[in-house]
């Protein structure tokens, strides 16, 4: 029994080890004692810094902190749930906390309390999440709560105020800090959000390592779907000597009602809307299915005239680009949203903001709903209970189901949330056929049941009921050992001590591989893996060992000095720096080759590469047919055709050479590809490129890749390696991304410039309209590349004699006649690097227009022909791209 004095009265808490700690007499001060009536989205949004930091008691006083925190919460219109009260109390008592409560029970407010308690005690706290977008969102939230001077962020792409007392980061960032600094790392308190990622086979190690290493820190482990974590909690208590409190099994503030529907999806949506169960989030397990469903629902009267008018007023000035943007524009004006990871960020935020304002009655999306998006939902409609996990189709796990289903029901608005599972399509058709036959035996005998497709993984009411009743599966450990992790451990202060010393490299590595959450067989495998990696590092000369035997005198030291952000940034950046030295700066292809090196270090954008390969194979088949190659040989040759891989042979040899002295790099795969280069060489804009490869459903992924390439090029390529052409290329890429959707680069720029006081772009009350794209003409270097690309595209088409495409671009330029005249004088049009050089373009600048001439490179070197055009600067500013009006192909 522990007695804890509070300012106004006493309450008593009984501690039952391994169980949720409930108060025998949980009599808090009046300021902490009332039950919440309405919490809503406000608990995780808009916590403005109107006094929390200034209210924190200094010196630390637990009683005063509880009252101050409650006063601040009330000033924000919030009242704590009993579960929140209990969780905050455990934090004040300086215990670890496992917080496994349903969605809508205010876990984010408990996280704020954890950071506030640490700040009040002069301690340093970390917030971790699985996605950079969630880290960024939480950063802006905490900046509003604690002020920009108290909050920092580190994501690997960028960092702002990294020495702040509160740091937001991805789980991998904290894991690497733990590996490199050990128990003495400057980490006093850790809030791990979405802790169920602990079981992720690829990334789960990053959630486990801090628990194993940071023995001084207090941990808050949060998720709505943790399952049984008693083993993890017991191990944490053993390692740290600090008790673990568990707040779990809390009743949802908005209960859920479940039903299984054997009704066509469109008809079911109409029923749900008629029953007043909007907004409805329809869960699909592919992006294509989500878009197709939304388009199918466009024929349904989802929104009333008044609702459509309100939507039109909200989105009136929003710029929807060609392609998917125009499709989305039509859908949202009908009250239907689409939400998935392949969309442009500004489109996703538009849908989220319209939904938060209650303007969208239906949102068709993917199961990303379960991780971090803030869309208020009354009803979750699951179109299936199976998904493809990258290897096979399988039924949803209990955790996956509850992650999504738990989002139904809006606290403060709904008395209950609805979760509806749709039967398989063939079963729905069979049910309709049976219903149509009625009770007529003859008609029923004629009904031919439709079979499930071959290989179909089915589900039914029993599957649904099992998922409803099932607790989330126990979290399975997924620790691993890599060369990069081993180097981090070997670089820890004191690691070069004799093997018998507690902090020596031998002891540190042994402790990690022998004392973790893995079963015995896996621990033995980790130990063997660590030994093999160590031998590789010694052979490469990265590690030196002095002494040996079993007398405990052996010492280990690294022979290389690691950069400060080793393994925190793009892991192949050091290789890229070395590979740049292999290029000839005088080569006309130097700029594109340098970009190809950067691209080879980035993650593969699989949808883009698949479409590149598909198109390349289609063109190859057409060419082989024209050459009369037989079918069998064509099929054999096709196997060798893939997406473009510039410098592949050079980079593969360089990679092997680099890995011989830096073996840790083998943990990261080199992947030559050409997306930025392909885009530039084709002289296309973003919309043209998306349309060319039919990537409308993945344009967000295309933009994310281009933005990653831009950041990597800016950060990795040193200034002394940047020629004028390479600077032009990088500036063009940045401007292209910015004009399509500036949110990615603006947010990154704000962070890297230290603008920590930037407002939260994710807030529900943020403007629906995105910030206007910057003036495309203001960056002369980038704008000039846009102009040159427009002209170069005409050169390419003219070289291929594609009159129809040129006429489509410039109907009044007289292309057919001009090309006839040109080819009477010359046999070909050059398209090599020299033909595209800056020397081949002449510009006469006027205040509102440029006169430009693209000189054609002919075989004789006469350079007497050129494309004359005018650049309209005002129109370019309006459209966010170079508006080039071609007058024609003319001879001097």
Question: Locations of the language-model features?
Answer:
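Helicase-associated low-complexity/disordered flanking segments
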Residues: 33-89, 93-96, 305-330
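Conserved P-loop/Walker A NTP-binding site and adjacent catalytic elements of P-loop NTPases
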Residues: 70-72, 77-254, 261, 279-284, ...
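Conserved C-terminal RecA-like helicase domain
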Residues: 126-128, 136, 143-152, 288-362, ...
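Conserved two-lobed SF2 helicase motor
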Residues: 163-179, 334-345, 354-374
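Conserved interdomain hinge at the start of the Helicase C-terminal
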Residues: 261-285, 292, 349-357
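Non-catalytic terminal extensions of ATP-dependent helicases
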Residues: 337, 357, 449-804, 809, ...
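Conserved segment of the helicase C-terminal RecA-like domain
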Residues: 379, 386-387, 394-435
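Compact beta-sheet-dominated globular domain cores
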Residues: 857-892
């Amino acid at each position: 029994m522990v007695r804890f004095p509070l300012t106004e009265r006493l309450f008593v808490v009984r501690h039952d080890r391994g169980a949720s700690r409930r108060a025998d007499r949980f009599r808090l001060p009046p300021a902490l004692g009332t039950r919440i009536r309405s919490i809503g989205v406000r608990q995780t949004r808009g916590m403005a810094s109107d006094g929390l930091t200034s209210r924190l008691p200094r010196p630390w006083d637990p009683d005063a902190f509880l009252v101050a925190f409650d006063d601040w919460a009330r000033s924000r219109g919030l009242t704590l749930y009993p579960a929140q009260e209990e969780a905050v109390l455990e934090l004040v008592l300086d215990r670890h906390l496992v917080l496994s409560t349903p969605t809508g029970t205010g876990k984010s407010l408990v996280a704020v309390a954890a950071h506030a308690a640490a700040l009040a005690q002069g301690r340093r706290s970390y917030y971790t999440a699985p996605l950079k977008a969630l880290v960024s969102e939480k950063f802006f939230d905490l900046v509003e709560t604690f002020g920009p001077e108290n909050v920092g962020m580190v994501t690997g792409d960028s960092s702002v105020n990294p020495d702040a007392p509160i740091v937001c980061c991805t789980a991998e960032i904290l894991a690497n800090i733990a590996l490199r600094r050990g128990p003495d790392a400057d980490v006093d308190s850790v809030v791990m959000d979405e802790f169920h990622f602990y079981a992720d086979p690829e990334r789960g190690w990053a959630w486990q390592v801090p628990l194993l290493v940071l023995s001084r820190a207090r941990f808050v482990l949060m998720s709505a779907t943790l399952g049984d974590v008693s083993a993890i909690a017991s191990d944490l208590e053993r390692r740290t000597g600090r008790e673990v409190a568990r707040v779990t099994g809390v009743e949802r503030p908005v209960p859920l009602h479940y039903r299984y529907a054997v009704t066509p999806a469109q008809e079911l949506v109409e029923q749900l809307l008629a029953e007043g169960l909007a907004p409805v989030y329809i869960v699909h397990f592919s992006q294509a299915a989500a878009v197709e469903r939304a388009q199918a629902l466009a024929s349904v009267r989802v929104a009333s005239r008044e609702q459509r008018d309100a939507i039109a007023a909200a989105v009136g000035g929003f710029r929807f680009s060609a392609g998917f943007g125009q499709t989305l524009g039509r859908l949202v004006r009908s009250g239907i949203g689409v939400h998935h990871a392949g969309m442009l960020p500004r489109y996703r935020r538009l849908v989220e903001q319209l939904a938060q304002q209650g303007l969208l009655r239906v949102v068709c999306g993917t199961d990303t709903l379960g991780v971090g998006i803030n869309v208020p939902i009354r009803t979750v409609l699951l179109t299936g209970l199976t998904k493809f996990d990258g290897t096979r189709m399988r039924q949803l796990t209990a955790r996956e189901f509850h992650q999504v289903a738990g989002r139904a029901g809006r606290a403060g608005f709904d008395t209950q949330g609805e979760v509806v599972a749709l039967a398989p399509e063939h079963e729905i058709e069979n049910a309709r056929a049976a219903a149509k036959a009625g009770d007529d035996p003859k008609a029923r005998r004629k009904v031919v049941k439709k079979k499930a497709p071959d290989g179909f993984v089915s589900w039914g009411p029993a599957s649904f009921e099992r998922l409803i009743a099932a607790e989330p599966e126990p979290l399975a450990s997924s620790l691993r050992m890599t060369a990069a992790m081993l180097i981090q451990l070997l670089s820890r202060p004191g690691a070069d001590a004799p093997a018998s010393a507690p902090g020596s490299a031998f002891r540190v590595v042994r402790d990690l591989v022998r004392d973790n959450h893995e079963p015995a067989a896996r621990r033995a495998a980790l130990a063997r893996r660590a030994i093999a990696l160590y031998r590789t590092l010694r052979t490469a000369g990265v590690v030196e060992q002095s002494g040996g035997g079993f007398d405990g005198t052996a010492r280990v030291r690294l022979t290389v000095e690691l950069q400060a952000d080793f393994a925190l940034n793009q892991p192949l950046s050091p290789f890229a720096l070395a590979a740049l030295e292999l290029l000839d700066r005088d080569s006309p292809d130097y700029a594109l080759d340098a970009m190809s090196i950067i691209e080879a270090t980035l993650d593969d954008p699989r949808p883009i590469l698949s479409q590149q390969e598909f198109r390349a194979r289609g063109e190859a088949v057409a060419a082989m047919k024209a050459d009369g190659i037989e079918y069998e040989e064509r099929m054999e040759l096709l196997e060798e055709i893939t997406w473009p891989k510039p410098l592949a042979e050079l980079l593969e040899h360089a990679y092997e050479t680099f890995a011989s002295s830096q073996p840790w790099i083998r943990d990261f795969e080199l992947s030559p590809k050409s997306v930025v280069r392909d885009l530039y060489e084709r002289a296309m804009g973003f919309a043209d490129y998306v349309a060319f490869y039919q990537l409308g459903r993945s344009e967000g992924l295309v933009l994310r890749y281009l933005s990653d390439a831009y950041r990597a090029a800016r950060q990795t390529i040193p200034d002394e390696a940047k020629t004028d052409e390479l600077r032009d290329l990088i500036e063009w890429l940045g401007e292209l991304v910015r004009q399509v959707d500036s949110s990615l680069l603006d947010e990154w720029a704000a962070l890297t410039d230290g603008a920590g006081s930037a407002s939260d772009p994710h807030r529900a009350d943020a403007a629906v309209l995105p910030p206007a794209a910057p003036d495309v003409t203001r960056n002369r270097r980038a704008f000039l590349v846009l102009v040159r690309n427009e002209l170069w595209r005409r050169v390419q088409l003219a070289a291929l004699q594609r009159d129809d495409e040129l006429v489509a671009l410039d109907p009044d330029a007289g292309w057919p006649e001009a090309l006839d005249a040109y080819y009477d004088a010359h046999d070909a049009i050059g398209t090599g690097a020299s033909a595209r050089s800056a020397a081949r373009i002449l510009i006469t600048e006027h205040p509102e227009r440029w006169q430009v001439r693209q000189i054609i490179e002919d075989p004789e070197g006469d350079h007497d022909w050129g494309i004359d055009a005018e650049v309209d600067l005002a129109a370019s500013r309006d459209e966010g791209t170079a508006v080039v009006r071609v007058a024609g192909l003319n001879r001097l």
